[in-house]
């Protein structure tokens, strides 16, 4: 029955001609072989004309803005730990701290330019920090205010941060695991009376792409590779492959699968296990993170059974512990994610280096753990 429903849905989608995302609607004039089409995991953006990524409750940041247009000092592989992959992006090297970790110095790359031709300098970094400290409602303002005393630029490629107290992790604010403090274009924002009310439309980018067009209803965004991509930090890896990248809201999981089967969606961010099984069987050109089950990269988060602590019974931690021990989490995983969910006995996922840091030391304690209910 499930197969029949899927076939019927696929036939319906074919007959409708992909009415939501008919290629003529958003790829007009763009050859299909020059564009990479990716799912926007945020779906439809409700305020699509807003590109000021530095304010709380901003517009979309998974619509290509963060991925293709923004840049900051460093990137790391969060799964690899502190001795793992470290990539200097806008910075030319790792941060340098003084002996007591109250001062951090950063050297910046030469030859990096904003998409409007203005050179990126230390003034942009200083402006980014000071502006958000002066406007603590901005996204990174509170974090900067908590740690930072002053930030200065001795020259156009050096930034010095003086901290209020020792903090050997201050650089983490500028280090991307998924997100970080993106650098603002000083020459654009300094002209605005209130940086929190500026829509930054169209965005001036440090990344290798610029915004070409977008749907006023927030359904799709198209980005075009910069002619001067060599003047971005990504150039150290070579020329970006696709000339265009489209981020779209492809709809629910079933529709994403159908679109990929029809080569209308190149990258799926999320789908159901059933959807991945369908792609694995029917689409030779579709590949997951792994060749086989569970296909996807284990996310550093945990699907979970969440209890409402406002309910009187659940306010008692012993009740919550009892339920945690009573519920068969393997059955929950099989019923909800076909066994593809990451399972953990504690509030930390067993991915990356976490097994070494948390699970191995706690293994014996977890195996022997019992809860005293007061009843025999």
Give the ranges of each region predicted by the language model:
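Ligand-site clamp/hinge motif
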Residues: 109, 197, 229-280, 321, ...
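Local pocket/hinge segments that shape ligand/substrate recognition
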Residues: 41, 174, 236, 269-376
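Surface-exposed binding/hinge segments that line
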Residues: 23, 29, 107, 142-191, ...
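Gly/Pro-rich hinge or "lid" segments in bacterial periplasmic/extracellular proteins
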Residues: 64-81, 177-240, 244, 254-255, ...
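N-terminal lobe/hinge region of extracytoplasmic solute-binding protein
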Residues: 37-99, 130, 204
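Aromatic- and charge-enriched surface segment that lines or borders ligand/interaction sites
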Residues: 93-138, 152-154, 160-162, 259, ...
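Bacterial N-terminal signal peptides
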Residues: 7-17
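Short, well-ordered beta-strand elements
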Residues: 33-43, 103-106, 128, 160, ...
